Every structure is written in structure tokens, then in C-alpha cells.
Swiss-Prot record:
GO terms for molecular function: rRNA binding; structural constituent of ribosome. Disulfide bonds: none annotated. PANTHER family: 30S RIBOSOMAL PROTEIN S14, SMALL RIBOSOMAL SUBUNIT PROTEIN US14M. InterPro entries: Ribosomal_uS14, Ribosomal_uS14_bac/plastid, Ribosomal_uS14_sf. Part of the 30S ribosomal subunit. Contacts proteins S3 and S10. This is Small ribosomal subunit protein uS14A. It holds the Pfam family Ribosomal_S14.
Length: 89
């Protein structure tokens, strides 16, 4: 499980990105890169790192399910993810 501080930091960055999204888009469309550079670094969507929604793990993230491979495997074996079943061929 990820540290609580890292999970909180990611949420804070996501909030900052949402706050400045319209302003960033307008500045980019106008080509005003000097004003764009004055915005906070965390206002850029590139700074967001995807994390597991259950425990905050940053690696081995599956976008389709919003969780890491470890939690995906555990929940899939338990039959708790709709539409997912063990393959057999």
C-alpha cells in the first residue's frame, strides 16, 4: 500500500489541474506561452500519475479497471469484477 501522503499529493495535483484547466486551454490557444509558464507546475496534466483506486499502488496499473494487477488478480479470482472470468482454451 502506498503512503497516505503520496495518495494525498496525487489528489492535490488532480485538484490543481482541474482548477487551471480552462485557463491553460485558453492560454495555449492564444499562444501566450509566457503566461502559461507562470502557472503552477502542478497545473499541468502531465504531472498526474495514475494510481490504484484501492490502495494507491503506482505501478502495474490497468487503466480499464482502475487498479493494479495485484488487486485485479485478487478480485478476479474471487469473482468480484463483473464480466471477468478465468481463461481456458
Amino acid at each position: 500500500m502506498a503512503k497516505k501522503s503520496k495518495i494525498a499529493k496525487e489528489k492535490r495535483i488532480e485538484a490543481t489541474v482541474a482548477k487551471y484547466a480552462e485557463r491553460r486551454q485558453a492560454l495555449k490557444a492564444a499562444g501566450n506561452y509566457t503566461e502559461l509558464a507562470k502557472l503552477p507546475r502542478n497545473a499541468s496534466p502531465v504531472r498526474i500519475h495514475r494510481r490504484d483506486s484501492l490502495d494507491g499502488r503506482p505501478h502495474a496499473y490497468l487503466r480499464k479497471f482502475g487498479m493494479s494487477r495485484l488487486n485485479f488478480r485478487r478480485l478476479a479470482h474471487a469473482g468480484q469484477i463483473p464480466g471477468v472470468k478465468k481463461a481456458s482454451w
